[in-house]
Amino acid sequence: MELLDLIRNRDIRDTKEIDLKGELAGITITIRAIDADEWQEARARAIKINAKGEPTVDNMALSSSLMAIGCVNPNFRDPAVLGGITVPTEFIKAKFKPGEIEFIANKIMQHSGYGEEAVDTAKK
């Protein structure tokens, strides 16, 4: 297949099932790759100004945003999933341990074309 044909026919939002670890072992969720605009949206939400007035990345805000955007099943933007909580990232932070959030966010990043090294760099 020609490169141009491959690019034209490519679905960059393909889905993938991942198995969770720890207390959630045995549970499978479906994630999807995020696109460039969604990456920028998640990163913008994670930028905080520190005490020195400098911008920094809040890793938990970034990871919970990536999880809210990149999870297909369950869909954390669906009000039926959220119950009484109205903000997807708040639901995620209330119902998942920090390590679980990081694990899922890293899987979404890897599925979006970032390797392990790029995931670490993106969080800096």
Indicate residue ranges for each PLM-predicted region:
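Generic detector of low-complexity/intrinsically disordered segments
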Residues: 5-8, 22, 26
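Short acidic-hydrophobic surface loop/beta-edge motif
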Residues: 14-24
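Extended acidic low-complexity intrinsically disordered regions
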Residues: 1-14
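Short, surface-exposed, charged amphipathic helix/loop patches that serve as local interaction elements
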Residues: 24-124
